Each structure stands twice: as C-alpha cells, then as structure tokens.
Amino acid sequence: MAHKKGTGSTRNGRDSNAQRLGVKRYGGQVVRAGNILVRQRGTKFHPGNNVGIGSDDTLFALIDGVVMFERKGKTRKKVSVYLPLTAVETAPAEAVAS
C-alpha cells in the first residue's frame, strides 16, 4: 500500500483565448485599403464592392473609401467600400471654370 495519499487530478483548469470576432469598422467610417472590416466564422457578412475575403472569412477593404453595410437579397448582408462622395463631388475650381 502507498504511504502517501496520491493527489487527485482535475479535468478543469483550461481557458482558451477569446477570438476577438465581430465588426471592426462600422458604416460611414473612412477606411484605407487593407483595413479589416469584419472578423467572422462563416459568411455572416458577404463581400460587396471593393471588399475582399480571406481564407478565414475575414472581410477587408480593397480601396480607400467609406464603409457601407447593405442587404443582399432577403436574408443576406454584404459590406462594400465606396469612394467618398466629397472626393467625387468637389472638383478644382479651375476645372469647373474652363
């Protein structure tokens, strides 16, 4: 027989790190090319105009612009990046005058 009581093991004692998923840039925010827009598991949000998708379903901006969240059909959502309206609307005064 053992002279000392053996210590019992426990099956607890682990805690994994958070995955930090979710929307990282919201609608109307200005983003640079390469900025991560959404980190997700599966395609809760689908890529729209000027948005790429990574191997882990992360959505990222392909151009500098403004983020827009839109509907894609009845049930799906998509994220797009468009050029800011101010850059398109405001032209140099010399170009307008001539």
UniProtKB/Swiss-Prot annotation:
Provide one Gene Ontology biological process annotation.
Answer: translation
Per the record, where are the segments of Polar residues compositional bias?
7-19
User: What are the recorded GO MF terms, alphabetically?
Assistant: structural constituent of ribosome
Region annotation (Disordered) maps to: 1-22
GO annotations of cellular component type: cytosolic large ribosomal subunit
Q: Which domain of life is it from?
A: Bacteria
**InterPro entries given in the database record:** Ribosomal_bL27 (IPR001684), Ribosomal_bL27_CS (IPR018261)
Going by the UniProt record, its keywords in alphabetical order are: Ribonucleoprotein, Ribosomal protein
Fetch the PANTHER family from UniProt: LARGE RIBOSOMAL SUBUNIT PROTEIN BL27M, RIBOSOMAL PROTEIN L27
In the record, the note on similarity to other proteins reads: Belongs to the bacterial ribosomal protein bL27 family.
Official protein name in the record: Large ribosomal subunit protein bL27
